[in-house]
Amino acid sequence: MIPAEAKPAMQGALAGMLATCSADGTPNMIHVSQVFYVDPTHVALSFQFFNKTARNVAENPFVEIRCFDPKTGDRWILEARFVRRETEGPTFEQMDMQLEAVASVTGMTGVFKLRGADIYEVRSILRVPLASPAELRPATS
């Protein structure tokens, strides 16, 4: 179940990351423009992937997704399983509008084309809080 405090990391403000693995165990990691909250047990990723990522997901549907809370800096690590691709409907339409909004703000209108909303079932989720500056400061003698 996705906790409420994780939702800000799934609103498309910051790019996420997707780690996949081929059938032979070769890993691959890419940035994804959107990690989108669908419901308490599902997220959607924008399908704009390179062929290697799409092939990996077809061979092995288990992935790791990382997304980031833009206010707190917390990282959320999701273990998930690919369920389906949607090319129409409410989730696809909302993601397409978000992608266009980001493109217009960055001066890249018309550059990005959402090909699909890939729906993933979230199997586990872990919050990794951002370390405070005091925790990052080297120890002095």
Regions found by a protein language model. Name each.
Residues 25, 56-57, 120:
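Buried hydrophobic positions in well-ordered alpha/beta secondary-structure cores of metabolic enzymes
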Residues 33-72:
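A short mixed-secondary-structure module that forms the rim of ligand-binding clefts
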Residues 67-83:
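Short, structured protein-protein interaction patches enriched in aromatics and acidic/basic residues
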